[in-house]
């Protein structure tokens, strides 16, 4: 049996599994954990330890058909201005519970499209955030940027407020692919955006690509990657397109007949990995690449790579505070998601309530399983002695799961004398499926994306 046939027989093209950007995955969250938990977790923060802050801006001028994010379209700035006002109100609510002296080691603006904000709104929001949670000395402020919705005044405003990393969504530069996903973005506009960012001192650059898009093939993806390499990013993420029209209604606009088949998707992923590694990048986890001197590559080599809701990260802050509709916070005590619908979120804030509406309170077992899965996702191994050192006898519950994974996914898993498990390079496409063996929660597969 060929390697690809063996991968296929193990369910590579059929399984739907979590991306494990959190553990447990978000579908496990419960309405039993809400605003009271949110307030208590914020009040328990240690001012001596910097936190990460995520700001969600759920607006776009145009809705890309492939996107499954919580976003809404608007052709005017009025709802955006109103929403920023609500963000400022939420910050004031958070401030009531926040211990004095808490600082932000990381600040990330995502969406939607944060660059839909005008320069005036950029300044207003950034200054309000810093008034409540000032930057730590060695901070990172990153912003997701749409090259078609940004100009020099916006970049200048972001730079003046401290942005030092930009993340540019690209997906694919091929005209027919862009037309099929409702996203027009010429390479020239993207290159001009990058040049302007660098002119304003933003030298750390991430780019996002997607494989498995309609009409995409090896030639078109290779041409896109060639152009991306010309931009000189420090990091690249390339995600598999998840076609879930039953969850993301706008995906019904995509013609399923021109989507690459499973084998073609697999070949596209392998092509991207080959081109980026040959282009001087180190492979990070299952879908990221970074220059050897980038902090993410350094973290990966030193065993400090972590997972969060943006994917892989070198962020060492133990707390993520989410601000805005649908944003998710991660506290030592567990996870908390803000009300997802923008109107309901605004209503909660206007009533003077913290907007947390569902979450999960972590147990000792959750911490153990979560760390085991994070090891697998970040390092392609499970270090059993390290789990024993941290969790004591409870780590022994991983032994039968290691045995199960080794039997189910042979010959792609090896187990050493210490009981630690490693995934061979040829089997790393199965990583999410292997991680699921260590997931103690049973959730419907329909909630998740394809494993490959």
Swiss-Prot record:
Keywords for this protein: 4Fe-4S, Cytoplasm, Iron, Iron-sulfur, Metal-binding, Oxidoreductase, Porphyrin biosynthesis, S-adenosyl-L-methionine
GO BP, one annotated term: protoporphyrinogen IX biosynthetic process
Keyword Translocase in record: no
Residues binding S-adenosyl-L-methionine 1, per UniProt: 54, 111, 144, 328
Entry cofactors: [4Fe-4S] cluster
Pathway field: Porphyrin-containing compound metabolism; protoporphyrin-IX biosynthesis; protoporphyrinogen-IX from coproporphyrinogen-III (AdoMet route): step 1/1
Catalytic activity: coproporphyrinogen III + 2 S-adenosyl-L-methionine = protoporphyrinogen IX + 2 5'-deoxyadenosine + 2 L-methionine + 2 CO2
Subcellular compartments: Cytoplasm
Pfam family membership, one: Radical_SAM
The Radical SAM core domain, residue ranges: 45-278
Alphabetical list of NCBIfam families matching this protein: hemN
Protein task: Involved in the heme and chlorophyll biosynthesis. Catalyzes the anaerobic oxidative decarboxylation of propionate groups of rings A and B of coproporphyrinogen III to yield the vinyl groups in protoporphyrinogen IX.
Family indicated by similarity: Belongs to the anaerobic coproporphyrinogen-III oxidase family.
Name of the protein in its database record: Oxygen-independent coproporphyrinogen III oxidase
Species name: Cereibacter sphaeroides (strain ATCC 17025 / ATH 2.4.3)
Gene: hemN
């Amino acid at each position: 049996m060929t390697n690809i046939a063996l991968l296929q027989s193990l369910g590579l093209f059929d399984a739907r599994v979590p991306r494990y950007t959190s553990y447990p995955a978000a579908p496990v969250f419960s309405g039993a954990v809400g605003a009271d938990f949110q307030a208590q977790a914020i009040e328990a923060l240690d001012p001596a330890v910097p936190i990460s802050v995520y700001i969600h801006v759920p607006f776009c001028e145009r809705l890309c058909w492939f996107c499954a994010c919580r976003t809404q379209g608007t052709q005017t700035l009025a709802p955006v201005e109103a929403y920023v006002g609500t963000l400022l109100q939420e910050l004031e609510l958070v401030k009531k519970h926040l211990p004095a002296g808490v600082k932000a080691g990381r600040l990330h603006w995502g969406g939607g499209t944060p660059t839909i904000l005008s320069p005036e709104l950029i300044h207003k929001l950034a200054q309000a955030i810093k008034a409540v949670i000032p930057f730590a000395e060695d901070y990172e402020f990153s912003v997701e940027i749409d090259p078609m919705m940004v100009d020099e005044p916006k970049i200048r405003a972001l730079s003046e407020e401290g942005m030092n990393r930009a993340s540019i969504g690209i997906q694919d530069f091929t005209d027919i692919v862009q037309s099929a996903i409702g996203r027009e973005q010429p390479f020239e506009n993207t290159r001009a955006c990058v040049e302007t960012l660098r002119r304003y001192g933003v030298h750390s650059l991430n780019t996002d690509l997607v494989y498995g898009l309609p009409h995409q093939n090896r030639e078109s993806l290779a041409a896109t990657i060639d152009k991306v390499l010309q931009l000189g990013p420090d990091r690249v993420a390339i995600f598999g397109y998840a076609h879930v029209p039953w969850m993301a209604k706008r995906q019904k606009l995509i013609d399923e007949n021109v989507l690459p088949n499973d084998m073609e998707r697999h070949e596209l992923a392998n092509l991207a990995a080959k081109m980026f590694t040959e282009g001087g990048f180190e492979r990070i986890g299952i879908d990221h690449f970074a220059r050897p001197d980038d902090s993410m590559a350094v973290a990966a080599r030193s065993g400090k790579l972590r997972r969060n809701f943006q994917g892989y990260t070198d962020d060492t802050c133990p707390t993520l505070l989410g601000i805005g509709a649908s944003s998710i916070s991660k506290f030592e005590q567990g996870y908390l998601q803000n009300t997802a619908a923008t109107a309901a979120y605004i209503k909660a804030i206007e009533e003077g309530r913290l907007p947390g509406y569902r979450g999960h309170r972590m147990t000792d077992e959750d911490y153990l399983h979560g760390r085991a899965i994070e090891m697998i996702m970040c390092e392609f191994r499970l270090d059993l002695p390290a789990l024993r050192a941290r969790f004591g006898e409870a780590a022994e519950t991983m032994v039968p799961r290691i045995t199960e994974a080794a039997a189910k996914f042979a010959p792609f898993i090896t187990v050493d004398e210490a009981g630690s498990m490693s995934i061979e390079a040829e089997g790393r496409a199965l990583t999410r499926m292997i991680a699921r063996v260590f997931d103690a929660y049973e959730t419907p597969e329909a909630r998740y994306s394809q494993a490959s």
